[in-house]
């Protein structure tokens, strides 16, 4: 899912995305990247996964289809750059899954319930925690990274253009993987958070329930309600 669209670009079912990951991948080798290898590849693979999803390809919801690029995007990039074994990658995916379980058990990962902060936010927290374990971070550091992620994405709305999981979802996956890398870097450097992960998950859920329906996957607000978006989707007239 993270590699196929790079090799063979394909247009999404809704026609809103397609080919972005190929452009990013080629850009990495032009010597002009602002992000460097890890982040550049992370956003490339994250966006590619969303292209696969939007063109009816096979993906793993992690934790949702709309946020499915973030965990593999970061983990695959780290493996490629640092040479982690497949066994090590499998191991840290359990870590990511544990963070996702905590969110599903105590809050939500659905954009229709909690906004994009619940989808991309939790996926980003999962990726950050897994990245910490890859680099031998402690369990507490994993939670610091995940907590930082949720602070940074608190209040993010779910506003898919045309009710499709394409745009701005693909861009949000790039932002989510970037956020995960930032949070993991901070935690690895020894930066702590006095608001624990459990409380951040709770407050994310509280904020999500306070979002109006227009900003929770209904495509009635945010980016989806802009004139340009309505013109693209032909559903608002």
PLM features per residue range, with description:
Residues 1-57, 80, 190, 197-237:
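Generic N-terminal targeting/processing segments that precede catalytic cores or assembly contacts
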Residues 36-53, 88-107, 152-160:
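Acidic-glycine-rich active-site phosphate/pyrophosphate-binding loop
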Residues 52, 82-85, 114, 118, ...:
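Long alpha-helical, hydrophobic tracts
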Residues 56-61, 109-115, 164-167:
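Active-site-adjacent structural elements in folded domains
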Residues 56-74, 116-123:
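Conserved phosphate/anionic-ligand binding catalytic regions in large, soluble enzymes, centered on
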Residues 72-84, 128-136:
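Alpha-helical support elements that line or immediately flank enzyme active sites
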Residues 78, 104, 108-117, 123-124, ...:
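N-terminal glycine-/lysine-enriched basic segments
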Residues 124, 129-237:
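Functionally critical mobile loop/hinge segments
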